[in-house]
Amino acid sequence: MDYKEAGVDVEAGRAFVEKIRQNVESTFRPEVIGGLGGFGGYFQLPSGYRQPVLVSGTDGVGTKLKIAHSLNCHDTVGIDLVAMCVNDVLTSGAEPLFFLDYLATGKLEASQLAAVVSGIARACRDSGCTLLGGETAEMPGFYSAGEYDLAGFCVGIVEKSQLLDGSKVQIGDVAIGLASSGVHSNGFSLVRKIIDTQGLNWQDCPEILAGSSLGEVLLTPTRLYVKPVLELLRSGLDIHAMAHITGGGIPENLPRCLGKGHSVQIYCESWPVLPIFHWLAQMGSVNAEAMFNTFNMGIGFVIIVPSDLARSTINQLQSSGINAYQIGEVIAGKGEIVGLD
């Protein structure tokens, strides 16, 4: 008996690395030293920093992967994986430098996992972030046939004096909401429960989705905010704080960037809620509080700026192709989000 007979094909693993090599290397920034295959990836810090601070983040895609498995559609969840990590790192004012992925599966299906990596590489290129390395673990008996799980890890850099830690936030600042592309990568356990309870399937096309299927809409990848937000930072715009709206929605995530003594008054009518959220609320009998505490509700990222910069911030974002809205203002408080009822 050998390792292959036990369910782990080492040669297939080596062949897989060669299959994805070109895609991975297409993400390399000039700071990369060496290539794939070593015990670690090497990355030289960019020049020009006086007091560089490294910012790290890690995340996954959650049970959104169940939909990808059901539909045999694997080229977008890699985008989700990168977006969940780089958007988090971005909130500190940091530029994402490099990304690593962990991919675990019961049996290595090369074409399936190559599609996943193609999405990872695409998102890394779109974010100016190197895919520096990763791990593909074949774990027979641990995952069902055709299933896999993903985790991502990102490191970014910011000048210490420009680190956004909530200390700049002031009463009277305004919250600029950047539109999400859909459900992104949070709340999918509730999504799947609603689908199952209603006896629906991913190919169904509710009228409210204007001809698109549930699967198409729900697999829409998480929006990458790196390029437009870095453009704002590099333009010298006085950004006071930023938040990535992920699990827990606006109530959970926006207070994390505020610092002490501040709350935010949100104006719920100030942005359009996407049709998929209306559909989920109706079909699942989910009240407004639960919706806001589970989903992004159409706002995937929030930037806090002085009130006199609101219009110019929105204009710059819209010129970058991101719909943006003035969704609230900073008030005195203890980290509450007011107005979501």
Swiss-Prot record:
Catalytic activity: 2-formamido-N(1)-(5-O-phospho-beta-D-ribosyl)acetamidine + ATP = 5-amino-1-(5-phospho-beta-D-ribosyl)imidazole + ADP + phosphate + H(+)
Subcellular location per the Swiss-Prot or TrEMBL entry: Cytoplasm
Catalytic activity, EC: 6.3.3.1
Keyword tags: ATP-binding, Cytoplasm, Ligase, Nucleotide-binding, Purine biosynthesis
One of the GO BP terms on file: 'de novo' IMP biosynthetic process
Principal place of residence: cytoplasm
Pathway membership, UniProt: Purine metabolism; IMP biosynthesis via de novo pathway; 5-amino-1-(5-phospho-D-ribosyl)imidazole from N(2)-formyl-N(1)-(5-phospho-D-ribosyl)glycinamide: step 2/2
Catalytic class of the enzyme: ligase
UniProt GO cellular component terms: cytosol
Domain of life where this protein originates: Bacteria
PANTHER family from the UniProt entry: TRIFUNCTIONAL PURINE BIOSYNTHETIC PROTEIN ADENOSINE-3 (PTHR10520:SF12), TRIFUNCTIONAL PURINE BIOSYNTHETIC PROTEIN ADENOSINE-3-RELATED (PTHR10520)
Family membership: Belongs to the AIR synthase family.
Protein known as: Phosphoribosylformylglycinamidine cyclo-ligase
